[in-house]
Amino acid sequence: MAAPVPPGAYRPNNNQQNSGGPPNFVPGSQGNPNSLAANMQNLNINRPPPPMPGSGPRPSPPFGQSPQSFPQQQQQQPRPSPMARPGPPPPAAMARPGGPPQVSQPGGFPPVGRPVAPPSNQPPFGGRPSTGPLVGGGSSFPQPGGFPASGPPGGVPSGPPSGARPIGFGSPPPMGPGMSMPPPSGMPGGPLSNGPPPSGMHGGHLSNGPPPSGMPGGPLSNGPPPPMMGPGAFPRGSQFTSGPMMAPPPPYGQPPNAGPFTGNSPLSSPPAHSIPPPTNFPGVPYGRPPMPGGFPYGAPPQQLPSAPGTPGSIYGMGPMQNQSMTSVSSPSKIDLNQIPRPGSSSSPIVYETRVENKANPPPPTTVDYITRDTGNSSPRYMRCTINQIPCTVDLLSTSGMQLALIVQPMALSHPSEEPIQVVDFGESGPVRCSRCKGYVNPFMKFIDQGRKFICNLCGYTDETPRDYQCNLGPDGRRRDADERPELCRGTVDFVATKEYMVRDPMPAVYFFLIDVSMNAIQTGATAAACSAIQQVLSDLPEGPRTFVGIATFDSTIHFYNLKRALQQPLMLIVPDVQDVYTPLETDVIVQLSECRQHLEILLESIPTMFQESKSPESAFGAAVKAAFLAMKSTGGKLMVFQSVLPSVGIGALSSREADGRANASAGEKEAHKLLQPADKTLRTMAIEFAEYQVCVDLFITTQAYVDMASISEIPRTTGGQVYCYYPFSALSDPPKLYNDLRWNITRPQGFEAVMRVRCSQGIQVQEYSGNFCKRIPTDIDLPAIDCDKAIMVTLKHDDKLQDGAECGFQCALLYTTISGERRIRVLNLSIPCTNMLSNLFRSADLDSQFACMLKQAANEIPSKALPLVKEQATNDCITILHSYRKFCATVTSTGQLILPEALKLLPLYTLALTKGVGLRMDGRIDDRSFWINHVSSLSTPLAIPLVYPRMIAVHDLDANDNEENVVPCPIPLQSEHLSDEGVYFLENGEDGLIYIGESVNSDILQKLFNVRSAAELPSQYVLQKYDNQLSKKFNDVVNEIRRQRSSYLRIKLCKKGDPAGNMLFQSYMVEDRGSGGASYVDFLVSVHRQIQHKLN
């Protein structure tokens, strides 16, 4: 009999009886840690909390609510079709009296501290009052019963295909009873309707007459050309009613013992003195990735068009005969209201990963959705760029699209989603395929009365272990399939046996390395780092497994003996920075419970100890190597606070900025070489760190060039992260530094991880891309993997796939939880194969397609000139649209730009990418290096906001009393939408800009900033909350955005009258014509012209 898994991963001080609230709440405002909803109104970014001793017992952690079951369906679900393997378990499915494996439903905490559903009496997540139950029929994502089946083409209508987006260029078509322009869909900016034409019209209102018949097939296929369209549609699947929406994970943000908060200004230099007394850090929600709110970066989910409205065209078909090339008119004749722009959505939807045993295309990442895992893994964990797999490499090549997976295995789930089940097979371990080593999953088919199974990945027929056998039902499924999570859930955690362990699971080791050079002391960076570390000590896991260490460095390295037996910490100096060593290794890293008092005393005194330091040098490389030697036997997290360019010792660097001095402009010749590491020293060190499971996170608090391209190699190779605070201000950056450090420590994460993706026969992994170390071709090593990190897995064909069959993908992540348990997280995805090009375009996933384009551009920037990278990104977009225009929409006039519905925003996002920080011809080299590193591990939901930010009108917040969402609908990034009388807020997930027009009403300025004119605003802006409705709403908006982005935005002030501030803000108006490139309208004209050229 298998032993059950202890419920849930261990989290520090999970004591529901603890009288103190979590550190991210206002203490005293709630007595019960579960009463999250009642406390949401207290999440004010400028309210100082009462004193809270940093060394006291840790309050209930953020993700410490009891799990709540997923809302049950209120409608009768249809019986699964025969051979429908995956399916939802019944209500009491997890309680099995016997037989392996045992399933652990996480109790107080799910594995790795994942957020779970809070109590049912709480309002919807986001802290807004409940508006009643969420009825599937009213807000759920369309639940198609899979994808249209391949088959012969249907009838050929006389208009553009359903799902296509025509944009007319030239003179508007004549209006009459039989022809009218498509009406706006109601989204901001008036995008076209996404639905199919009315019954019987077949798109006739933009028709150019019937297509010619008898078109020959093109030369692009060998043998008979496959049909383009099938008669299948996207019918709605079953709907169900969910319970009330749940509250979010608790917020992040308020450090103990905080004083007044100071804001940030991008225009003034921070003072050259040590940090002032601790500031009041805003307390705002810090939760899951961006899902709720304004959904500004994509259209809301819509019913996918049915096939009968699409023309039957032939794969390889060329342009229509006698087709004339219409000249492109001036942009002034284009109806701006018909240009595709991101829309917005409101209420959450419920999304089932499979419906009637067929894959269900995922909703956009910009939609707030609750996933019901019915066989495929949630799209939060794994997304495919195309939700139907092309059967041949030729078909994929013709489409021009990427075939890749974006995998985020530790992603935060929605609070109302079912936590990931933990399955324990005992000493035998999970059932696996003998040939490919794939793990048992819902798509393995059991035969011979359950005595054998067929692997869905390699096709091998294997013997079922005797203690895992079970009879089959009349539908061919195992009778216990719905009772076993591994047979009915796309995502599951297996308990790993000793077979998966090279050594015992590593303890939780946190080592802090602080720059105390003269510049770091004078700018206040050292004091800010010490203050942040001291405040997060209470957030570290408690218990005997938690160890800490600390060291400082300038031109030498200083370790500290923190043994309790000593009256005070003892400094141990390492002067040799060429051949470093660690003195008294056993005394440098000690249990947190033994050294907490000494550690707090040391952190308070470090800024004073080095106050008179005159050493401008930094032995960064040597200090990191010495800290690694101390951690070599255990592994762990090394957090480095760096302020100046490493100049002495191992890995010393010189200022490479443009041979000239000052700043390296990205537009200079061969500038891309400055984005490559100076040498291989730090890279070689990083590979060794990864081998011993040491993850390095880098906090760069600088006011000058630090050669980000070189030093970021360490975190990128070890699964870490780079945080950049440039130019560092002791008045405004400590709040962000504290919140970044706290989230780094408390977010769900795993350690000493190894990941591999397996694919069905015919598809194989081509390449992995992200923050990791790769020593063998098939696996990637991750000393740490957290909920914010994503990995791109590009795929390629190695054989032809069968049309109508399903292609399977399985990602397996072996990792150690924060509590020291070894687990295997398995993600499964099974999606259909198709021979029809039109199906590829219909099922394309814009979010992951663009995320791949973004990551590939970032990978190419260090090795290519910027104009070439921009040109490649634009050409990729044109290739995709040309393929659709040529093979799927050849019946329309060349005077129209036809965009596939699923990818209608691809031109806008491509334009935004070419104008973004990474591809601008001006700017600092370090800024570009940071951008490249940031994009490397960026998750899919954050990819589009990074290049196409969200902008809202702050001055109109008072008028949005009836809005469901805290964050109002976004405004297009076009200067014509900016009023001189308005105040606007723009955010991209990293930075927030407040733009103030020249003629803003003094009452608005008084309410928001407590001044009568913009000239009175101080250079160091402080975001305050005043006693009026507008100020309160703006603070709520900032809090909500920070929660959505899981990021503490650096807020900067941009006044139109100030040249630098105005230029900074205008650089984000990507739809305008400017030095960065063409306007959105001009770009569409250019894309259309190039498509016409290719067609001719």
From Swiss-Prot:
Recorded superkingdom: Eukaryota
Q: Which SUPFAM superfamilies match?
A: beta-sandwich domain of Sec23/24 (SSF81995), C-terminal, gelsolin-like domain of Sec23/24 (SSF82754), Helical domain of Sec23/24 (SSF81811), vWA-like (SSF53300), Zn-finger domain of Sec23/24 (SSF82919)
Q: Where is the composition biased (Pro residues)?
A: 47-64, 79-92, 108-122, 150-160, 171-186, 246-258, 287-303
Where does this protein hold Zn(2+)? C433, C436, C455, C458
Region (Disordered) residue ranges read 1-315
The UniProt keyword set, sorted, is: Cytoplasmic vesicle, Endoplasmic reticulum, ER-Golgi transport, Golgi apparatus, Membrane, Metal-binding, Protein transport, Transport, Zinc
Annotated Gene Ontology MF terms?
A: zinc ion binding
Taken from the record, one Pfam family name reads Sec23_helical
Q: Which GO terms describe its cellular component?
A: COPII vesicle coat; endoplasmic reticulum membrane; Golgi membrane
Expression sites by tissue: Mainly expressed in pollen, roots, stems, petioles and hypocotyls, and, to a lower extent, in leaves and cotyledons.
Zinc finger-like: annotated span: 433-458
Ranges of biased composition (kind: Low complexity): 12-23, 65-78, 93-107, 140-149
Q: Where is the composition biased (Polar residues)?
A: 27-45
* A GO biological process held by the record: intracellular protein transport
Share what the entry says about its subunit structure, partners included.
Component of the coat protein complex II (COPII), composed of at least five proteins: the Sec23/24 complex, the Sec13/31 complex and Sar1.
Q: Give the function comment from the record.
A: Component of the coat protein complex II (COPII), that covers ER-derived vesicles involved in transport from the endoplasmic reticulum to the Golgi apparatus. COPII is composed of at least five proteins: the SEC23/24 complex, the SEC13/31 complex, and the protein SAR1. Acts in the cytoplasm to promote the transport of secretory, plasma membrane, and vacuolar proteins from the endoplasmic reticulum to the Golgi complex.
Return the protein name.
Protein transport protein SEC24 B
Give the originating organism. Answer: Arabidopsis thaliana
